[in-house]
């Protein structure tokens, strides 16, 4: 079965390039057709590479379904459902980081520092985004969401230090890409649209997912 993963990982990259082409050309029909194939392919690649790593491909599945909901981003309720599915995927990543790198046994001061930094990061994002997102509820939702991105980025750094394994920095890189992608998505959805908006959103999103998945896979047996 692992042979299939060696086919599916390159297929994911090929499909990503094709999808990004349609994003750049603003071909809505084929952009919407190709988008759901991306995380489905990546999730299947993980499944065939390491069937026991079910949480990794379950997180990909939540992103796959979330992608489908976000195709209807003009409907605010559907957009919220899609965002919630991505939040579940991030929570799965949080659990993986804590359980895989023994973060559950680290000193409580690490969590105190996390709490302080998360509050600071959330407040900074809340006020930085203010010129681009006037609605208080939407700005609050954005700030809370990116706090989860920050938490996973923080845990990936702590995991790197605890395990002496720099491969966890791939997960950090992934969450930096996620922050760029989701910030662009929020601004263009709730403030002002830009030409070819889907190209930078999807480019950074796909780099984020690939970095995170590779980070978890490459640290499987370490």
Residue ranges and their predicted role:
Residues 1-222:
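Polytopic alpha-helical membrane-helix bundles and their juxtamembrane interface segments
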